[in-house]
């Protein structure tokens, strides 16, 4: 399944993997998964975290390594995000609930994820998604961005 990913996607997932893998040992534990989920405003229980790991933990060692992570991401991409998941993600970014994601809100979430972006990078991300050119991302634009492969 992971063999259907492009080089670029694999590189992106490698970057995402290292955001999760806080201690850099090449595996993601339930603790590390929990940290990232919480930084995204989610509050999973220990059991839910364990389930998430078990779902992709091919060798059964209780952690996720990069190949397992790739499989998980490929699977997620195949059953493309449901409307509800996208709406949920939008809510995480839209801190003040005004229906738009501003550069400041985007920067805030990315920083929480441990992703230090320059103002230029944040502006570039907004520009890429901002179809109507108002300098922020509305829900429709967000959906387009999330569903365009």
From Swiss-Prot:
Family matches, as SMART domains: EFh
Keywords noted in UniProt: Acetylation, Calcium, Metal-binding, Methylation, Repeat
N6,N6,N6-trimethyllysine, modified sites: 116
Cellular component terms (Gene Ontology): myosin II complex
Domain of life (superkingdom): Eukaryota
Residues binding Ca(2+) 2, per UniProt: 57, 59, 61, 63, 68
Function comment: Calmodulin mediates the control of a large number of enzymes, ion channels and other proteins by Ca(2+). Among the enzymes to be stimulated by the calmodulin-Ca(2+) complex are a number of protein kinases and phosphatases.
Family per record: Belongs to the calmodulin family.
Name recorded for this polypeptide: Calmodulin
Organism: Metridium senile (Brown sea anemone)
Lineage of source species: Eukaryota, Metazoa, Cnidaria, Anthozoa, Hexacorallia
